[in-house]
Structures are given as structure tokens and as C-alpha cells.
Amino acid sequence: WLLGMNLDSRRNIVSYEIGAAKIQSRAYFDKKDELPMYESFPGWEGLSAALQAKGYDSAPRFVFSGTLYSRSGTAPMVFNAVDPGREARLLRYPAFLEAGRFPEAGKPELALGALAAEKLKVGIPLRPTKAELEELAAAAPTGEDAAFVLSLYGPPPAKAKGAKTSVFENKDPARAAAEAAKLALKEGATKAELDRLWAILAASGRMDVRIATTIDLKAAPESIRGAKFEGELLPALGPEARARALAAYEKDPLTGDYRLAAPGTAEAGAVQDDMAASGFSGAIRHVNQLVDAVVVGVVNSPNPKTNGNVGFIPLDALQDESGLMLAGRVTELLVRKAGADDSALPGKDESPEAIAAAVAAELPEGLAVRGWRDYVADFLAAYNGDNVSTRLMVFFLFLLSFIGIANTMLMAILERTKETGMLRALGMTDGEVLLAYVLEAGLIGAIGSAFGVAAGCLMNIPMVAQGIDYSAVSKEMGGDFGYRITTLFKSAWNPLAIALTGVGATLLSAAAAVPPSLRALRMPVTDSLRFE
């Protein structure tokens, strides 16, 4: 089961979230959890062309955080500014839209994760209350549109008799009653009807949102107080960076402050990079920015990372002063082999080393290629923790089995002490008697393990085919609990583990016969024959 969750999560990370690798600046990677916009890089087009010539797809991104405002609320978000065409070629989530469409290049359009859309009441509501539906109808442009909106909703369909319910479903009566009182979008709604409903809701202003963010820009201060320059900046710099700073700034003999001698030059740019790398607070300029956008789609893919508080907006819509003033810069370039199989994990030709070698001539200093595993610490922590727990459980199960088998063999050999003495009196060596008991115990273990493995395989068949519905757990945890799975946790076949289990159980049973057999063989033959 854990193997199935692990494999599905790895595939979903590669196919829906990251690709095989990312090209980023080393400085950005060191602070990636902070999403440092100022550590972006230009010239990604040349890298992309070089990758394409070597048989790789690539997709640029500019990742930033902010707050999204809708008519009904606000939510903290992570935004991915993407190239829609390249993104769709490399990753698969743009095809998994719950409603609407993916944003088009050059337009201030936004696709939201399903959970964010639900929180902000954006998109097509699937389970509105009666009051919410009446509000939607009242906001429709015409009476005909209002009637159309009302016609698409009705009471939720009753569960079929005997229908399966998730074992993890919340059984709170109050919550169940509230859910039962909600209406539901009719199951037979066609794409044309949903598109018309989306257009009506968009015309009412439901899809209008505003992004509030802070643009972080590297900027060498034109003036720095002397105490701060000498006491904070210079000690944080290396010898070469310190020399550049002293050459770029001149000390005012009257005030003692340091002033930038030549703003806008290459030397000033090098100094501002040194300041940012050292963490000097004055090297980053913060600019508050508002960006108006329209939500055109809701993403609901098999990877929960694309379905949470995340938004996707065209990269070219944020280039100028009305956006983020990107000037062609990106924070990362996703990479995947062209035509790669979604069911397969990246191979050697998609390793960071292979990708770096393919673009070595075009890869600027300061940029590095890193594999997808470097970006999924949450998943690896969850998997490793569960793996340790599983190993401990297996260890204790084997320990209990060993104790049970050893106790059974002890009683069996103890009851046959006279038989053991008779065999030894008839000429069998101690080794032959020991071998007989070990083979007997091993055969018993083999029969038991065969039944156990067969029962386990039979139980695993529905686990592989259907899995366990964890959608209720996923929803309660906001869709993000480490593993990149949204609803069904499926098992997988592991022939090696199955074979090792059978062989291990057989050997364990045989080993359990050794201690009581040796105890019986240490008894003199005469005492064995008189044993009662």
C-alpha cells in the first residue's frame, strides 16, 4: 500500500508539479521557501532553445506570493506566472479543469486551485446553499439568465442503497445536516450549459479578482549611514565583495555617510548582488503592487499541490509597470524530456547532470540544474516517516511470529523427548536429528507462509484496482498532507517483497526449531528415554 502511494505521488510530482528538473539561480534555491523575487534571472529564452535542440521541453515560471481578493473574501496565495503553451506541453494539470479554461497568453487571466476557488466563492459553485443560489440568480444580467441558473441546481441525489461511504467521512450530525440542506449542480449538465453558466457568473462580476503583492527588487542604496556601512555591511561581505563596496561608495567627510559614486553602472550592479547575497537589509527595495485579473478556470488535478491556494497567470501579462515589472526575468525554468511517458519516472537522460551537460555552453554562471527530489522535502519527510513506521511494524510482526513458532516447536520437541532419545539410540547423529526437526519446522512455516502470502495477495487485488477513498481526509487537511494524492490511495504489486516474505517466514520457522532442538540434544540418551 505504501509503495502504491509512493509511486503515484512521485509520478504526480513529475507530471503535474515540477517536471524532471528545474534551472534556478543558486541564490534563489538557498532561499526558495521565501520565494525571493529579486533572485530571478533573464535570458531564459536562450536556455530554452538550447534545451529544445537537445530534445527537452522547458517552461519558464515566475513564482511569487500575495493575497487574492474576491467579492466574497480574501486568501493568501502562491502565484505561478507561466507560459500557457509551454506549461501545457511539459505538465498535465492544465488539462484537469473542473470548470472554465486555462488562461491565454497576454491576458490578465487567472486559473485557481479548486480549494482556493471554493474559499473565495469564485467559479461555478457545486454545492451552494439556497440563499447563495438566489444571490447568483439575482446577479444575472437578464431574467432568462436567472431562470437558467436556477434550472441547473436541485436537491442532491440520494445515495443508492448499499453505496459505499468513505470510512474517513466526518460523521458530525450538524455538518451532515448542513451538507444535506445544500443544493447540487445537476449531474447531467453539458459543457455548453456549464460554459453559459460561467459566462453569466463572469458578467455578474463573480470572477473579478485583485492580486495584492509586494515586488522585491535589488537596489544598491544611494546613501548608507556610516555606522551601518562599516558595522553591518562590510563585516558581512567577503574580501572581494568588500573591496567592490569600498570602491563603489565614497565617504562624505562631513556626515560620515557613504554615497554611491556611479548609480546604474555594472559596478553598482555587482555591489547590489553582493549586498543581496549577504542578506543586507538595505539591498532590497519593496514596492506594493495591485494587479486586477479575471478568473477563467478552476484546476482540480490528481496532484493536490495544484488544487490548493495557488493561481496560474500568463507570464507575459506581468512584464510591464501594470504587472510585476519583470523585464523578461523568471525565477525558474522547468525541464522534461520531450515525449516523456507520464507513467515513468525521469531516467538518466533527465538527471540534473545530463541536463546540465546538454546546456553547459549556455548555462550562465550562478545558475544550476536541480532534480525534482530537491523540491519535495514535505513528501520525502512523510514517506520516510511512514516507511520507518512500516518497518517497525513488520519487525514486531516477525518477532511475534518467531516467539509463537518457537513456543510451538518447544512444546512439540518436548513432547517427543523419548522419540528423540530412541532415534539417537538407533544410531542417528545429533546433526541428523537437528536437521530433521529444522526441516519439519521449515515445512510447517512454508505451508503457513504460502497461505499467508495467498491471503495477502487476494486482499491486495481490490487495493490495487479500487484503493481506499481518502477524499474526506484530504478535504479536512486542506488537500495537502505530504503525499501528492487527492482521493484514492491505491496499493501496488511488489513481487520482490512478496517473495522475500514467503522465504523469510520459512527460514524464520526453521530457525525457531534450533533452540529447543539443541536443548533436547544436550540431554543424555538414557535420560531422554526415561523422560515423562
Language-model features: where?
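Short helix-loop junctions at transmembrane helix boundaries
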Residues: 5, 451-500
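Mechanotransmission and gating elements of multispan inner-membrane complexes involved in transport
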Residues: 159-390
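C-terminal membrane-exit region of the final transmembrane helix in multipass inner-membrane proteins
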Residues: 488-532
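Short, solvent-exposed hinge/capping segments at secondary-structure junctions
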Residues: 91-92, 112-127
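Hydrophobic, regular-secondary-structure patches
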Residues: 1-78, 88, 94-106, 186-187, ...
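Solvent-exposed, non-transmembrane alpha-helical starts
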Residues: 32-42, 69-71, 76, 88-92, ...
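Hydrophobic alpha-helical transmembrane segments of multi-pass inner-membrane transport and secretion
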Residues: 1-5, 384-419, 442-455, 503-511
